[in-house]
Design a protein with these regions (language model features):
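Sequence/structural segment immediately N-terminal to covalent heme-attachment motifs in c-type
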Residues: 19-41, 59
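Short coil/turn linker and secondary-structure boundary residues
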Residues: 16-19, 58, 78, 101-104
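An amphipathic alpha-helix signature
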Residues: 60, 64, 68, 80-91
Length: 104
């Protein structure tokens, strides 16, 4: 009987985590996908692709500072937590191989 509360807690955590990822994807599509496209490919050279190396850029303080100044980011109606979730979504969805090992 003690397993039931643990199982319920695990299910609740999984659902909450899934909602967070879904929200980040929706926010990406609403605030970034119009220019960078749903698959992150962008429209080079005007709109850079998010595929490939941006994970290396986000690892640098200057890269994160630049990312915060992109018009869709700096003018988005997202709070800091939602914005961080969108950036994390973009990095893991489009750049998993280029991310630093300690990326969370």
């Amino acid at each position: 009987m003690q397993r039931l509360p643990v199982l319920v807690l695990v299910v609740i955590c999984l659902v909450a985590s899934a909602d967070s990822t879904a929200d980040a994807r929706v926010n990406y599509l609403l605030h970034c996908g119009g220019c960078h496209l749903p698959d992150g490919s962008g429209v080079p050279p005007e709109v850079p692709s998010l595929l490939g190396d941006p994970g290396k850029i986000i690892a640098l303080p200057q890269g994160r500072d630049y990312l915060m100044r992109v018009p869709g980011v700096s003018q988005a109606l997202l709070d800091n937590a939602d914005l961080a979730e969108v950036i994390n979504y973009m990095m893991t969805e489009f750049n998993g191989d280029s991310l630093p090992r300690d990326f969370k």
